[in-house]
């Protein structure tokens, strides 16, 4: 059995959760980076003997559209899938059911699902430092239960919470822009999952293409990209009430 780590993780939180799970599962791991716009996703083909951990962040309670679109190009061919949604301690709403549908359309059989918490990608004070050691222990335990199901080739589908039709997707509200510290090194443009940043002039941003993933902020070696501080403060204030209380990881088998 080959194990595929199929992950969309612009700021690294989702990948940390995915790695906690895949490192505790059996099989040689092949990583498929759904943020890589240069990758030929149509060339990725699994078999029914394989398993995949498919992980995405929750953006406003939905799967990021670009992640769903790239996953649709992958050929699951009956491979078993563990669905993972990672959220910033607010709520994941319809993310898991949407991911379940996207995985099914790509030819995967969903046998388990996990909802986990990682540091909020925009308001980073919420769920700061997560996944932490407590999460890692919990995810490792989840992986053991998932491995048992994989070893038995148990193909029963988990009961996943969420709504169909899904909630309405929100637009990108925060578009990071360069500060005067920008040296036009181009790291942000190379790393942007949707190529919203001009490669010739990283100070130019396509506001309509941007998905507010905050990848450019997280990869900038000069800390020279920032979100609008007034808007960021408003978002933080709005999230404070719903994000402050610790939420735990969940397993659906």
Stretch-by-stretch model annotation:
Residues 2-36, 42-173, 230-236, 241-253:
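FMN-binding flavodoxin-like domain, especially the glycine-rich phosphate-binding loop
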């Amino acid at each position: 059995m080959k194990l595929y780590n199929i992950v969309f993780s612009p700021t690294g939180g989702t990948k940390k959760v995915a790695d906690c799970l895949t490192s505790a599962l059996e099989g040689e791991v092949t990583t498929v980076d759904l943020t890589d716009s240069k990758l030929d996703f149509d060339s990725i083909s699994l078999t029914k003997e394989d398993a995949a951990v498919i992980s995405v962040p929750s953006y406003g309670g939905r799967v990021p559209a670009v992640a769903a679109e790239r996953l649709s190009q992958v050929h699951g061919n009956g491979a078993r899938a563990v669905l993972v949604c990672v959220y910033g301690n607010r709520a994941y709403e319809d993310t898991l059911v949407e991911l379940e549908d996207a995985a099914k359309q790509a030819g995967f059989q969903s046998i388990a699902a996990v909802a986990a918490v990682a540091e909020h990608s925009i308001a980073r004070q919420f769920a700061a430092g997560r996944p932490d050691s407590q999460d890692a222990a919990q995810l490792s335990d989840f992986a053991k239960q998932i491995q048992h199901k994989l070893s038995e080739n148990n193909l029963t589908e988990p009961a996943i919470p969420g709504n169909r039709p899904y909630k309405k997707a929100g637009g990108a509200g925060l578009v990071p822009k360069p500060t005067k510290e920008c040296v036009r090194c181009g790291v942000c443009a190379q790393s942007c999952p949707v190529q919203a940043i001009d490669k010739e002039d990283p100070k130019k941003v396509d506001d309509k293409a941007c998905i507010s993933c905050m990848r450019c902020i997280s990869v900038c070696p000069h800390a020279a990209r920032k979100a609008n501080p007034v808007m960021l403060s408003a978002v933080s204030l709005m999230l404070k009430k719903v994000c402050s209380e610790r939420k735990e990881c969940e397993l659906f088998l």
